[in-house]
Each structure stands twice: as C-alpha cells, then as structure tokens.
C-alpha cells in the first residue's frame, strides 16, 4: 500500500469520473393509468394486458413466491419483492440523462455473487462518531482510509470510483428489475430508500476498515439535527484532504447554518430562528411519521415503476434539502451532492447518509415505532460488494438491527424530540361555515392543476372527532396525488393546513405541514412520450388537526406554495387516508 503522504499528493487533483458515450437502447412503452377522476377505477385494455403479463412474469420468478403467496384476494395484480440485479445482464448505461451527461455506472463483472451471512455477535461494536465531535486522531485515520480507497484501480469494486457509481446505478435507472427488462430498479421514492442506503454504507465502512487493517473503524455521521452539528463538518473542507470535494456550494461552508427547509437558489440563511426552525422540521418529519408507510415510504414491488410509489417523510425533508444545500449551484446539474448520479462522488454524502440511517435507529428505538412486516419489503434485495471485492446479495430482512451488523452511533443529545411546532393562531378556520364567511382565499375545485402560483383547496375528511385510541390505531394522512414533474430539475413546494393569512406560516409553526422536494436525478420511463415522473406525497396530520383544534371539522383547507420550479409541477388531486401500523 502506498504511504499516506504519497496518497495525499495523488489526491491533490480532483478524483476523475470519466464520461462515456451512451449507446442507444430500446425500451418497451409503459402502460399508464388514467389520471382523471372519472376513470380512476376503470383500467383500460392496455392496463388489463399489463396486469396479465405482469402476473405471468411474476409466476416465472420462482416457486418461492408462488400463487398462494402473491395472489392476495383483494389485489388484482401479483406482488413480489424486488430482487438483486444479475450481472452483467441487468446493468446498462442510465437513460434519459441531461444533455451532456453520459456516464457508465455499471460495476465490473468479477466473481459469482454469494448470499450475505449475518456476522456472529460482535465482541466490540463499531461506533460511528458525530463528525463535529471527532478528534484529530480519528480524522487522520479516516483520511488515511479514504486515501487508500481512492488509490485503488478504478476497476476494483472497492475503489472510491466504483463505490460512488453504486449510487449512480441504483438511482438513475441503470439496473433492470429481474424478470422485467423494461422496468428499472430505483431505490428512492419508496420503502427501499432506508434499507438500501444502510447496506450501501455498511460495505463502504467495511472496505475502509479493511484498507487500514482496522475492523473497528466506523464512518462519521453529520449531526445536522443538533445545533452544534448544523454546519458542514470542518473535516470535509480542507482542499488538501481526501475528504474534500470541489463541487460544493462555497456559500455554505462553515459556519453557515444548514437550512433543513432549503429551497434551491436561496441565499444562505441568516434567520435568527434558523436553528429553531430546523428542530421543528425534524420533529415534523420524524416524530409525526408514526406509521411505517409515512416514515419509510410507499411499497414498491417487482414489476412496478417507481412512479407508482412515494417518498417517506425523511427522504424528502431533510434528506433532499441537504443534498441540494450541499451541491454546487455553479454546476449545470448541481453536482456533486445536488444530483443523485454524482452524489456518491462527494465524501460528505456518506456522513450525510449515516445521519439519515441514525434517524431510522431513533425512530424505532427512541420513539418506539414499528417497521413494515410485509414479506415484499423484508425479502427485497440488492447486490453490493464487500471488503474482499466479492459481490454479495443482501436483503432488507437482515438490515433491521444495526447492532447485529456490528455498529452503533455515538450517543448525543436529540433536542428536536420535544420541539413541537406551535400554531400561529388559536383555532384558525374553526368550521366550514365560518371559514367561508371570514376568509378571502379563493378555493379551487378542479384537478389536475399546474402549480404556477399559490393555490388553496378543500379536502373532505371521511372521519372526524376520533378518540385517542382511534388516532393511535390509525393515522390520518393527507395525500397529494399524482404529482407529475420532470425529475432532472430541483423542485420544491410547501404544504399548509388551514393557514388563513396571506403570508405562509414559518417552519416552526403547526400550519406548515410539510414539503415536496425533488433532488435532480434521471431514470427510465416506460412511457417514452412523457418524460415526467409521477409520485405522491403523504403527510401525517392527526396531531396537526388536534393542535389547530379542528378535529371536529368536516374538511380542511390545504394550501400549496411553489418554492422551486413554479409551473413545472402538475397536481392530480388530494385526499385523506387512514394508515395503520400493519398493511398486510
């Protein structure tokens, strides 16, 4: 192995990620669903054909998911878990990339894959430290490990080049789903988000430790959810360090406070309430996400396009906002952190996602929440490379307990758990009759709509005045449906409930319920005629309605405010759902 000093000299120049010519590829046309309300329950002939073809294909995946397991009586189509891709056949250059971006994300074809074996109970856990609390000895160790990773040949699956490409491949349509050559694997915008990234960081960490012969080495987490960690960690900003990346927003270097509600294009925040706003956002996105579907995201099964799912609460905000806050606005596609194809090229990415992973730990252990129990989630799988350059098939079921994987997080304060937002006004819009008599807000009543200005609309509530036990059993959820947009652009709109003032409520106020955030990415579309992505936004609102004292109302007024990409988003509708812990 080269010495640390020689590696540091090697890394003084930017790490190279060459571009490649993108070959053409034929893709089958996606069967799209009817968008209008009149036809929502009437599949057309193409949809029926797709349902039959998908059913036959799933039966062909094997006896493990035979008809008795994947033909629920209340579903018209089969379900089965996403399977690990098969190399090299399942991988190809990403499609629908932005002009001038031609990348090759596929890993080298080196060995036959093996199934992951859970390690025996470790005698000593790897402890991931908060980045801002790391001591100089640890920082030097991390620099040495990453320098060694960057010094590996680019065709080595353990190299930083190949590790960065993992995110590119899984997040930009480079992998086909097993059995569905016209449907890509996408690990964002669904229940795959948290377990995939946990596995990704697990092997990244193991490789780093092996390169410095230290099995106890653990990567740091960017503690952006606590006041003293709400800035880009200093260990990542030395231009002469392997932890540095030149493609970041220079206006956001320390000690600029991170904005967890960041809208792309905004100037650095100097809001004296910024820290309080950040803590309130963390409360909304983690504490209020009481059910697995809200926290993890909607299901995604084999044969389904990612368009048919939806983000969990953590993925949009703060995860997406931090990607955009860190990315370089001087780059055409907000590289590196600001675009999924390039995010893994920045060492800051792994510290960011370590804290995202930590949120999963907190959600389960500090808040007592429950993961999905669906087999299609537990048996979903991915293909990654271990510290021996061995391709390994891994499954969600083995990633549920980080301690069994041999690591834990440094214990630090979690101030946002008690940072509940407060209403701007007591009992706003107390009932439908009074709201109509007192507000000057014009309510729209026609969908779909193009979100090119602030809009408000009424959403009926199927149930009201529920008991405490009913609310604990079922979370009331506001669903913004059929959000259509082009995924290669940064986008954001905010959602407010019963916010009657012309100026929207602040992030630390109850009326501000949440946001839709899109980090630029590229993925294959089944329908080549429509390049837009379709998704859904789900927000738990039981606690919000209690705090606003409107749980007895027949309806709520929802206001959408475009922040980034005005006019580039179409909204298909909105409704109220009730979500339980288990959705088998």
Curated annotation (Swiss-Prot):
Reaction(s) catalysed (UniProt annotation): (+)-larreatricin + AH2 + O2 = (+)-3'-hydroxylarreatricin + A + H2O
Compartment annotation: Plastid, Chloroplast thylakoid lumen
Cofactor binding, note field: Binds 2 copper ions per subunit.
Class in the EC hierarchy, top level: oxidoreductase
2'-(S-cysteinyl)-histidine (Cys-His) cross-link, renumbered residues: 171-188
Taxonomic classification: Eukaryota, Viridiplantae, Streptophyta, Embryophyta, Tracheophyta
Signal peptide: none
Role: Enantio-specific polyphenol oxidase involved in aromatic ring hydroxylation. Involved in the biosynthesis of the creosote bush 8-8' linked lignans. Has a strong preference for the 3' position of (+)-larreatricin.
InterPro entries on file: Di-copper_centre_dom_sf, Polyphenol_oxidase, Polyphenol_oxidase_C, Polyphenol_oxidase_cen, Tyrosinase/Hemocyanin, Tyrosinase_Cu-bd
Main location (coarse class): plastid
Span of the transit peptide along the chain: 1-32, 33-79
Proregion residues excised on maturation: 432-584
GO MF annotation terms: catechol oxidase activity; metal ion binding
Organism: Larrea tridentata (Creosote bush)
Binding site for Cu cation B: 319, 323, 353
Family as reported in the entry's similarity comment: Belongs to the tyrosinase family.
Any single Gene Ontology cellular-component annotation: chloroplast thylakoid lumen
Disulfide bond positions: 91-106, 105-168
Cofactor: Cu(2+)
Listed name of the protein: (+)-larreatricin hydroxylase, chloroplastic
Keywords: Chloroplast, Copper, Disulfide bond, Metal-binding, Oxidoreductase, Plastid, Thioether bond, Thylakoid, Transit peptide
GO biological process, one term: pigment biosynthetic process
Binding-site residues for Cu cation A, renumbered to this chain: 167, 188, 197
EC number: 1.14.99.47
């Amino acid at each position: 192995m080269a010495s640390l000093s020689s590696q540091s000299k090697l890394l003084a120049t930017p790490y190279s990620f060459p571009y490649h010519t993108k070959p053409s590829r034929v893709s089958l046309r996606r069967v799209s669903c009817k968008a209008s309300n009149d036809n929502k329950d009437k599949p057309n002939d193409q949809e029926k054909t797709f349902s039959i073809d998908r059913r036959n294909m799933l039966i062909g995946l094997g006896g493990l998911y035979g008809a008795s397991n994947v033909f629920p009586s209340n579903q018209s189509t089969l379900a089965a878990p996403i399977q690990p891709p098969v190399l090299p056949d399942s991988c190809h250059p990403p499609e629908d990339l932005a002009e001038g971006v031609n990348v090759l994300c596929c890993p080298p074809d080196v060995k036959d894959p093996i199934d992951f074996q859970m390690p025996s109970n470790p005698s000593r856990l790897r402890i991931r430290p908060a980045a801002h609390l790391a001591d100089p000895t640890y920082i030097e160790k991390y620099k040495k490990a990453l320098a060694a990773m960057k010094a590996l040949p680019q065709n080595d699956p353990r190299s930083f080049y190949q590790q960065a490409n993992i995110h590119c491949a899984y997040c930009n349509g480079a992998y086909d789903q097993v059995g569905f050559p016209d449907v890509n694997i996408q690990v964002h915008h669904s229940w795959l988000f948290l377990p995939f990234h946990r596995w990704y960081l697990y092997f990244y960490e193991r490789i780093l430790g092996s390169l410095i012969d230290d099995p106890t080495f653990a990567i740091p987490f960017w503690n952006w959810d606590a006041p003293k960690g709400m800035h880009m960690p200093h260990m990542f900003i030395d231009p002469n360090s392997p932890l540095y990346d030149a493609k970041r927003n220079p206006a956001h270097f320390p000690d600029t406070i991170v904005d967890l509600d960041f809208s792309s294009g905004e100037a650095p925040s100097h809001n004296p309430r910024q820290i309080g706003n950040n803590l309130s956002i963390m409360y909304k996105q983690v504490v209020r996400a009481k059910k697995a579907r809200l926290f993890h995201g909607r299901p995604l099964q084999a044969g389904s396009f990612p368009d048919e799912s939806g983000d969990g609460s953590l993925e949009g905000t703060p995860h997406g906002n931090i990607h955009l806050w860190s990315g370089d606005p001087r780059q055409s596609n907000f590289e590196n952190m600001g675009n999924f194809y390039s995010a893994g090229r920045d060492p800051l990415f792994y510290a960011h996602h370590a804290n995202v992973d930590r949120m999963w730990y907190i959600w389960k252990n500090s808040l007592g929440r429950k993961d999905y129990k669906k087999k299609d989630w537990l048996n979903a799988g991915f293909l990654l490379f271990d510290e021996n350059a061995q391709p390994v098939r891994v499954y969600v079921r083995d990633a549920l307990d980080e301690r069994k994987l041999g690591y834990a997080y440094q214990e630090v304060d979690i101030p946002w758990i008690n940072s509940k937002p407060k209403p701007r006004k007591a009992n706003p819009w107390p009932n439908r009759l009074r709201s109509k008599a007192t507000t000057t807000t014009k309510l729209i009543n026609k969908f779909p709509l193009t979100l090119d200005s602030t809009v408000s609309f009424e959403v009926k509530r199927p149930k009201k005045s529920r008991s405490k036990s009913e609310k604990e059993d079922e979370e009331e959820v506001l669903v913004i449906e059929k959000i259509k947009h082009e995924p290669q652009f940064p986008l954001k709109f905010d959602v407010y409930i019963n916010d009657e003032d012309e100026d929207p409520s602040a992030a630390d106020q109850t009326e501000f319920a949440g946001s839709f955030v899109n980090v630029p990415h590229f993925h294959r579309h089944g329908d080549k005629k429509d390049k837009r992505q379709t998704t859904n936004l789900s927000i738990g609102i039981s606690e919000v309605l209690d705090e606003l004292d409107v749980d007895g109302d027949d309806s709520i007024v929802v206001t959408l405010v475009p922040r980034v990409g005005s006019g580039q988003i179409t909204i298909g509708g909105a409704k109220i759902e009730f979500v339980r812990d288990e959705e088998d």
